[in-house]
């Protein structure tokens, strides 16, 4: 991701026709983040979700393992006056945060990329307070077979072309399909959250299930 950080947002705008910003704004809206709360935008990338949450008034930390991505986020936050956001480089599998310390965790397009999704979810659960909210935005697997086939073809052939044209790096986007095939997606992620004793897990399908949002409340 470091090699494509400078043009990461451009490629996302092109490949989704700008819709990724709409989906992230929906995450921000669903998060119900408010003044007096403490939140974490995990795998924050260039800061889209963090910027949106910062406007809600709570104290927010944006964490990512990739320094070039954090540098892009810092530049964007500086332009937008994101005083309520503190950025930190950290591993999602070993969060430098105390137990039960957060009201909210969001993770956009990051869970699928963790070295161990199960360990990542356990860490998120550890730092969330009882009653805390977890929102996950990521690629999904459409239930409709025809749509899924067309979607996979797009990810296999079209998306890497955008990556090559905009960043000179097709491989950074070609991996998405491979990672998605291994990702449990909508029902699989919900099942893992159920095992971690979240009392409420909602799945919101977007664009026929090509994307999805999970909203979970910790017991």
PLM segments and residue spans:
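Core SAM-dependent methyltransferase catalytic element
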Residues: 190, 196-219
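Class I SAM-dependent methyltransferase SAM/SAH-binding core
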Residues: 38-94
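Conserved beta-strand signature within the Rossmann-like core of class I S-adenosyl-L-methionine
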Residues: 132-139
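Conserved alpha-helix/loop element of class I SAM-dependent methyltransferases that forms part
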Residues: 7, 16-37
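A short glycine-rich, Lys/Arg-flanked "PGG" loop and its adjoining helix->strand segment in the class I
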Residues: 118-130
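A short acidic, Gly/Pro-enriched loop at the edge of an enzyme's catalytic core
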Residues: 93-104
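C-terminal alpha-helical "lid/dimerization" subdomain adjacent to the S-adenosyl-L-methionine
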Residues: 140-192, 196, 202
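Hydrophobic beta-strand segment of the Class I
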Residues: 8, 105-106
């Amino acid at each position: 991701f470091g090699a494509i950080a400078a043009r990461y947002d451009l490629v996302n705008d092109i490949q989704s026709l700008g819709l990724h910003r709409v989906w992230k704004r929906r995450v921000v809206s669903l998060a119900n983040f408010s003044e007096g709360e403490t939140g974490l935008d995990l795998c924050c990338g260039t800061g889209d979700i963090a910027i949106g949450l910062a406007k809600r008034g709570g104290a927010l930390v944006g964490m990512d393992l990739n320094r070039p991505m954090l540098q892009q986020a810092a530049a964007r936050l500086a332009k937008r006056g994101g005083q309520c956001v503190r950025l930190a480089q950290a591993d999602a599998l070993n969060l430098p945060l105390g137990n039960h310390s957060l009201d909210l965790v969001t993770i956009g397009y990051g869970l699928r990329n963790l070295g161990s999704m199960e360990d990542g979810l356990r860490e998120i659960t550890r730092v969330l307070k009882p009653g805390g909210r977890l929102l996950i935005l990521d690629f999904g697997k459409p239930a409709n077979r025809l749509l899924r086939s067309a979607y996979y073809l797009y990810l296999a052939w079209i998306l890497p072309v955008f990556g090559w044209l905009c960043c000179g790096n097709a491989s950074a986007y070609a991996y998405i399909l491979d990672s998605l095939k291994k990702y449990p997606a909508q029902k699989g992620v919900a099942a893992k959250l159920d095992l971690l004793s979240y009392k409420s897990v909602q799945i919101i399908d977007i664009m026929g299930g090509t994307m999805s949002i999970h909203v979970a409340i910790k017991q």
